Regions:
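Short, flexible, basic/aromatic active-site loop/helix in glycosyltransferases
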Residues: 10-16, 25-49, 53, 64, ...
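Membrane-embedded multi-pass helical conduit in multi-pass membrane proteins
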Residues: 143-206
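Catalytic donor/gating beta->alpha subdomain of glycosyltransferases that bind UDP-sugars
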Residues: 70-133
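Basic/Trp-rich segment in TM-proximal cytosolic loops or flexible interdomain/linker regions
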Residues: 109-161, 178-181
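A generic structural signal for short hydrophobic patches within well-formed alpha-helices
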Residues: 62-63, 100
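Conserved donor NDP-sugar-binding/catalytic core segment of glycosyltransferases
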Residues: 1-31, 91, 97-99, 103
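Short glycine- and hydrophobic/aromatic-rich loop-to-beta-strand nucleating segment
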Residues: 48-61, 67, 74, 79
Length: 206
């Protein structure tokens, strides 16, 4: 209340006792190298911070006046609510130290489907909130197309190798584990391609 915030949120983080795969998934979802830092609560992220349902607070009267979460949305309802907060002129603050340990799916096929649905939801969000899709949301789709093209171009494969190497180095440094670093390559590619595929699929069907 002392901050004057109408709504607030914080980053998601990995607890030290998370499994290696949980830490790798967290890296894929929060690193600047993968999502532009928009989920990690970084002031240097590529998009304005928007609270997500796993770490969000809002004044009750404001929540009710906006109608709460959209019940007709299966995915992306928290971002939809955050966008409505901004459209309403609410004061939304990021509390960088108010992190939540967020356990995500560690089964790669389920993780792929989860991020694929997030990519699909982005198209729905753009339909509801024109102009809300930023460059960072297009990057996974571009990456997905690039991966397909790189299969036939040697320098493309070289660039993907350098990107994977960057993920390995950064994640290993953050997690103090080369094993987590290696897993982060897998989870990062899964995250980007899954989201990109869902984004492209929904865009073509819209």
């Amino acid at each position: 209340a002392q901050t004057g915030a109408d709504a607030f949120g914080g980053p998601d983080a990995a607890s030290p006792d998370f499994s290696p795969m949980q830490k790798a998934v967290n890296f894929a979802m929060t690193s600047f190298l993968t999502t532009g830092g928009i989920r990690g609560g970084s002031a240097d992220s590529m998009e304005q911070f928007k609270p997500r349902s796993f770490n969000m607070g809002c004044k009750r009267e404001l929540y009710l006046s906006l109608g709460g979460f959209s019940e007709d949305m299966r995915y992306g309802e928290d971002i939809d609510f955050s966008l409505r907060l901004f459209a309403h002129g609410a004061k939304v603050l990021l509390f960088p130290l108010a992190a939540v340990y967020h356990k995500r799916r560690v089964d790669l096929s389920k993780f792929f489907r989860q991020v694929m649905h997030s990519g699909e939801a982005r198209i729905d969000l753009e339909r509801r909130h024109p102009g809300s899709t930023k460059l960072v949301h297009y990057l996974p789709a571009l990456f997905t197309v690039f991966c397909a093209v790189a299969l036939f171009i040697s320098y493309g494969r070289g660039l993907l190798f350098l990107y994977a190497l960057a993920i390995l180095i950064v994640s290993t440094g953050i997690n103090q584990s080369i094993y987590v670093g290696l897993l982060s390559i897998v989870t990062s590619f899964t995250q980007l391609i899954g989201y990109g595929y869902g984004f492209i699929k929904a865009k073509l069907m819209s």
